[in-house]
């Protein structure tokens, strides 16, 4: 039987001392996000996969994590929970505002590459010919836009003089459109196909307008509470997202979720209308072209 010499034993002890003691576990970093607003609400699947992947690739450095689904919440409610450090949420996904920049911790990487800033209209099927004739922003100003109560887009559109009708219930907005409470339901290119496909049988009057692309810069970020733990959660997620951008993982996930939407909506062929977003500040990373989708150059 061979016995280890003194140097081998010493080396073994040094290595073992660097490892966690048996049964010891690292503190689990917990990311709590809101639940979908209905069984048909799949708007956030891509964004949570981006976050989950960022946490996976940083596990060797940061240790274990878990993602917890809380209750359904409006954007207003999510912001309240984060700003007041209630513990009911530790992360939300929403567009930038000066208030959020001041009172929360953002990761300044547009999660959807600003694809959500390219919008199309859900309309009533019989109205398509009316929309075909629209050629200027003044033409669009004659229409009423449907949006959710408290959505950041409401103030953006009102700042450009558009007439906005709001509804407090996400599912109810689709019915409001069909009932002619407003002329169009403004939807992000990231959302509209799933919304239409999941509701077209129940609401056969729904139609995706097929000629217009409505754009404003809308960087959608992950936001965290302004606490020590919030800073840790944000630092880990940002590190993972930047690793994904560098090795191409980010683009691959984006393409898997978004390419068919970009192609099916024919974004390159639509006539585009642009308005400014007064919420966008100097911290917006416009200079890094890797972070921004452009339909004219997307391949």
Model-derived features: where do they sit?
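Short helices/loops that flank or line small-molecule/ion binding pockets
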Residues: 68-90, 159-160, 171-190
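Acidic, polar ligand-binding/catalytic clefts
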Residues: 70-140
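An extracytoplasmic/periplasmic, membrane-proximal ligand-sensing/linker region
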Residues: 240-299
